[in-house]
């Protein structure tokens, strides 16, 4: 028999009346009614109301002086509540326990934060006292939700014949794009392990090893700055790799997995379509490769409409190689001047020269600072391409292509929010496909990989030999949900001749590739199957399903914005003897 409890704090019902029970938990609330003190006892599962009577002086005095969140074990008799005190909001609301004996298991100091409060305490307090923060319902429920989601993901993968395999945590430095966390070797002086940014090479080698379908709930470590949707330090992903698959095969595997999880753990409407949007179209029409499809606004390129027009500012920009992008604003033609001025000021804060705009009256006649410079034919083309209606307005950005893309995307997002256009209680997924294989680094004045160097170029070796590298597309893909990238993946480059050629375009010799990726090139010499994979982010999925605004709300022990663990006081200094053992010394920053 368990000496601490006969029942959990959510289990007692009317049928337990007159039974003696033992309960353990935390003092959640106390209500002093003079000769009676009511205590809400909380454990992981629920709450039971305890009754302490003044007649039982010893127990009464003890509970009087105990602080909230102290841990106690009680023995008592289950009784029916008075009809006036029945609480249907809790499962045990028809009964209470009259306490006959109490043991203090752990006394609490004064609390730095109130467990019962929904107050938004400073992050410094919450993370330093995370063990208290995790007792709060909202945070606790997020962690429970995370556990259930991971369990469901495992079930889905196993049902499809995937094998869960753990890959090493100590490995070599990788080229994923972020900075590595390095671990010095005690035995091999001057050498370092790296914590994996992703199990990329290992999972590809597993395919070469003959495993057909692999997955794991993989920890990934990247020395990156924090964002609302990115936790510094570490994150977890559902890492997947499959042999003998095309891009479409990967899509067909992961779509039902995501739909199952999102439908099971949310009451929101889920659009079951996963539209395919090319990277080019995403940047053009949404101003982002992470488009939020709940926002119906579509950006259009109107450069040719303004070319050789009487509006000299845009016309001059176009002659210098700039572009013009249009962002519609439905039902805003009668908005006050301040509405338009605010958008112009917003664009300027982002580095824009400004914004142009045209408003269309109910008779579809055009007004605004630009309208008088455009003939009827050009105005009609704008109406048509932007799908405008009487009473609408349209904003214009004219900048270099990259800058115009960024600005138009920001204006689109702002308008979607201000005009209340973003769908509520909906999840909208999409695939972003056809990423560029290479990019031009203006700073280094060289060609480099756009994203994943291990992906297969569309067109294979022939494309690498004959096409402009900047025109080559990759078999790379992202899944985006409500403007948040939750997964990226690729069909891998499994042929050494294609790999060597691709890396040579990015400035790597064959010898450099063999040295940097020795394990992979060595494996590929012994029969590598076509393979591909994807890796949805667990943290971001939970964040979406929990309706959290910050990813740290769904991580049990997160680092703060500065990459510090306030609970464990990490990172910390290491004593000189330990440094000496690792052949390390600390140089002061100048």
Curated annotation (Swiss-Prot):
Which ranges of the sequence are coiled-coil? none
**How would you summarize the oligomeric state and partners of this protein?**
Homodimer.
**Underlying gene:** aspS
Q: Does the keyword Ribosomal protein apply?
A: no
Q: Which SUPFAM superfamilies match?
A: Class II aaRS and biotin synthetases, GAD domain-like, Nucleic acid-binding proteins
- Report the protein's function: Aspartyl-tRNA synthetase with relaxed tRNA specificity since it is able to aspartylate not only its cognate tRNA(Asp) but also tRNA(Asn). Reaction proceeds in two steps: L-aspartate is first activated by ATP to form Asp-AMP and then transferred to the acceptor end of tRNA(Asp/Asn).
Catalysed conversion reaction: tRNA(Asx) + L-aspartate + ATP = L-aspartyl-tRNA(Asx) + AMP + diphosphate
Q: Where is this site: Important for tRNA non-discrimination?
A: 33
Output this protein's name. Answer: Aspartate--tRNA(Asp/Asn) ligase
Under CDD domains, the record lists: AspRS_core (cd00777), EcAspRS_like_N (cd04317)
Chain sites annotated for binding ATP: 222-224, 485, 537-540
Its keywords, alphabetically, are: Aminoacyl-tRNA synthetase, ATP-binding, Cytoplasm, Ligase, Nucleotide-binding, Protein biosynthesis
Its Enzyme Commission number? 6.1.1.23
Cross-referenced InterPro entries: Aa-tRNA-synt_II, aa-tRNA-synth_II, aa-tRNA-synth_II/BPL/LPL, Asp-tRNA-ligase_1, Asp-tRNA-ligase_1_N, Asp/Asn-tRNA-synth_IIb, AspRS_core, GAD-like_sf
Q: Where is this region: Aspartate?
A: 200-203
Gene Ontology CC entries for this record: cytoplasm
Enzyme class name = ligase
Q: Where in the cell is it found?
A: Cytoplasm
Task: Family membership, please give it.
Answer: Belongs to the class-II aminoacyl-tRNA synthetase family. Type 1 subfamily.
User: Can you name one GO molecular function term for this protein?
Assistant: ATP binding
Matches recorded under PANTHER family: ASPARTATE--TRNA LIGASE, MITOCHONDRIAL, ASPARTYL/LYSYL-TRNA SYNTHETASE
Record organism: Ehrlichia chaffeensis (strain ATCC CRL-10679 / Arkansas)
